[in-house]
Amino acid sequence: MRFAIPLGAACAWAGVALAALQIAEDDSTITLNNDRFKAVWSKSKGSVVDMFLDGQDLLGPQSGSTGIGPYLDCYCVPSGFYTAGATNPRMQYVEGTDSTGTNYAGVILNDTYTPTGQQFQQYWFLRDGETGLHMFSRLAYYNETTPFLRNLQEFRTLFRPNTQLWTHLTSSELQTAPLPSKNAVSKQVVVQDATWRFNNTPDDAYYTQFSEYFTKYTFSNQWRDNDVHGLYGDGTNSNGSTYGAWLVMNTKGPLHSDLTVDGIVYNYIVSNHHGEGTPNITNGFDRTFGPQFYLFNGGKGSTSSLQDLRSEAAKLADPSWNAEFYDSIAKHVVGYVPSSKRGSVDGRVKLPKGATNPIAILTVDGQYFQDNSVVPSSYQYWTDIDTSGKFRIDRVVEGKYRLTVYADGIFGDFVRDGVTVKAGKTTTVKEKWDAESAGKEVWRLGTPDKSSGEFRHGVARDPTHPLHPPEYLIYWGAYDWQSDLPKGIDYRIGSSDPATDFNTVHWSVFGPTPDNPDVEYNTTHDWKINFSLTKKQLRNSKKATLTIQLAGAKTASGNTDVYNASEPYINLSHESYINDQKEPLSFVIGFNQSSSCIVRSAVSCYQVRSRMEFPADWLKVGENTLTLHLPYNATDTETAILPATVYVQYDALRLELD
């Protein structure tokens, strides 16, 4: 790759004016600014170190790793975390005019981690008339001596302010709250990894309005539902002017979820907090991720509300936004695929009766869509399907894809491999989705929607705080199994209420919690589902099928996908007993299917499902009982402050007769 040579580089200070857009460079910094927005990069840090909107400091003073950003870091070197630019940062700028006639300037960081030879590039671009930074992030590894390095566990950019300007954080309408005060943070009590209790400061605005507990996972969100997230300053510390700092997500998941904002505005590009797979870094690995856009809005004299500034940012969450600009800067960005090498998919799928909220996903051919990372060079696209079954996905990099369609209310997915996309062409797809069936449905429990949120302490709103966040987002230890379900789960089809009588998580062991030191083993591991059958239902039936769909499951591997033979529950067996049968219906949740789901405030993670057939004569006229069994007191070794128990989270269950 060739870079534009900085003009006047031999001088102590160089300045280049592009109409209102200006570039300045000295021995230690590069500065880009236009009429309203200014960003300063430190050549020695490889990061933005100062940022201003209408003269207002958005970052605050530098202190260690705070007061800087956006910057790039990862969990990807043999020792773990690494911040791009920490070894030998080489900073250069580029400039130009895009195809729309708009001037732009960019700053490019190059850094090589010497022990492994991993190459990092971070790109930041500012356009004239915009108040934000367009960003791309690249990691490359070429090493024949060590062809397998490790997994790319985390790859992210962070806007990490150190200022009282910001007063609120938000990742959705339901996940909006005041930031905890410095006083609350100074007196917080650790209850779990990255989770604190503010019981020592009950008058703090976060405590009174949102929750007694704070965890970065409370504001995590699924990418399908996440257009924009960030920070808001209500003017309290900025002379009445309001400000917003947003990560605009014009590329998404859809089931992937992770951290969004907790005082830091994150762009989690690759991660596995909720059990998604991560790509391996092997010889030849070379990926450029982006674009993403950090927008800073409001400004001097602004009285715009959080909702107004958020809505302004959300309008930019469109993959086609600024496409001409991205094509113009593709010559600067290694690995970015321009529009000339992209095509479209125009499809129509006849949906099964009862399908709602359908979605179409393009992922790597031949693989389950949540395993897209097994091919590190793969891409992923998705779009909602309208009520007539139509969808269109534009700007798809040419190649061969798997099409997956799923919908709320329908068990299973529709899958078609071999969807070929050619540059400049539109691929047409017409399909009919016949919902899977193993006979006549006798009953179902839960809604097949890839979430356990409909059950107790799931999406139900917290009644004790005026902002009423969904209960699952708070912290699992805020609730007490022994108080909620002292006799365990004894559910009756047709009369029990799934929102109160079926828990969002099936623990092997529960506790302790901050308010209850007891550990409960006896009522947690076996759950009973009772149901009645008539003679008519059983007549002529030879085969029964039990379908269990899990929205998430935790084995002893947690969210690492690492096999450890010393852990007895590294692969977790889930067993279902029909009436008094001694032999269970079993399926194994593999170590590479495990998620750290509910303990990190999620009800939808890596999906696992099984359809198990058994003789219909195991059932009887009248009362029947299905027992869902996890191993008794099944735990693992945790290196972080997290519950050691294994658990599963049910999406939905169904019994069919044939």
From Swiss-Prot:
It catalyses: Endotype eliminative cleavage of L-alpha-rhamnopyranosyl-(1->4)-alpha-D-galactopyranosyluronic acid bonds of rhamnogalacturonan I domains in ramified hairy regions of pectin leaving L-rhamnopyranose at the reducing end and 4-deoxy-4,5-unsaturated D-galactopyranosyluronic acid at the non-reducing end. Coiled coil: none annotated. It comes from the Eukaryota. Disulfide bonds: none annotated. Residues 1-19 form the signal peptide. Keywords: Carbohydrate metabolism, Cell wall biogenesis/degradation, Glycoprotein, Lyase, Polysaccharide degradation, Secreted, Signal. It is an enzyme of class 4 (lyase). Its main location: secreted. This is Probable rhamnogalacturonate lyase B.
